[in-house]
């Protein structure tokens, strides 16, 4: 299907992800990743959106998402996660900067809305990727 190919360019750095690594993270979590995120991982992988040198802009790998969600490893006592990222209907998937993340809505089946804090910034992962490919900080003013 290759719907995420637009993000494969010299401005970004992605790493291949084996399906087995995706399955291991899902087993740890006890649920499947949203359909769009699974497709993205298998088509593109995980890695960095380059643009603003003052930001991390990282699509998190599945193991890190599991660590954050389960509060394990270095995320066990991470105060940045308290309160803001504890909604069971949302999944942290993207690191904007240290301690600042974007989340996906887990209630949708085909398309997952993307949120910056509590503000919806895209109706789907595909829409988010198109926007962030053009401007990696497009959503920052939307949170106000």
Q: What do the PLM-derived regions correspond to, one by one?
A:
Residues 21, 115, 128-131:
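Short, hydrophobic/aromatic alpha-helical segments in well-folded domains
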Residues 1-100:
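A surface-exposed partner-binding patch
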């Amino acid at each position: 299907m290759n719907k995420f190919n637009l993000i494969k360019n010299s401005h970004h750095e992605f790493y291949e992800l084996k399906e087995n690594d995706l399955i291991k993270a899902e087993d740890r979590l006890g649920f499947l990743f949203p359909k769009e995120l699974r497709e993205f991982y298998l088509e593109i992988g995980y890695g960095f959106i380059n643009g603003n040198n003052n930001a991390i802009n990282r699509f998190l790998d599945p193991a890190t998402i599991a660590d954050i969600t389960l509060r394990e490893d270095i995320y066990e006592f991470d105060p940045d996660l308290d309160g803001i990222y504890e909604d069971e209907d949302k999944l942290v998937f993207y690191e904007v900067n240290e301690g600042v993340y974007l989340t996906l809505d887990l209630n949708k089946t085909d398309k997952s809305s993307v949120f910056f804090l509590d503000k919806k910034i895209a109706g789907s992962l595909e829409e988010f990727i198109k926007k962030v490919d053009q401007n990696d900080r497009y959503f920052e003013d939307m949170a106000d």
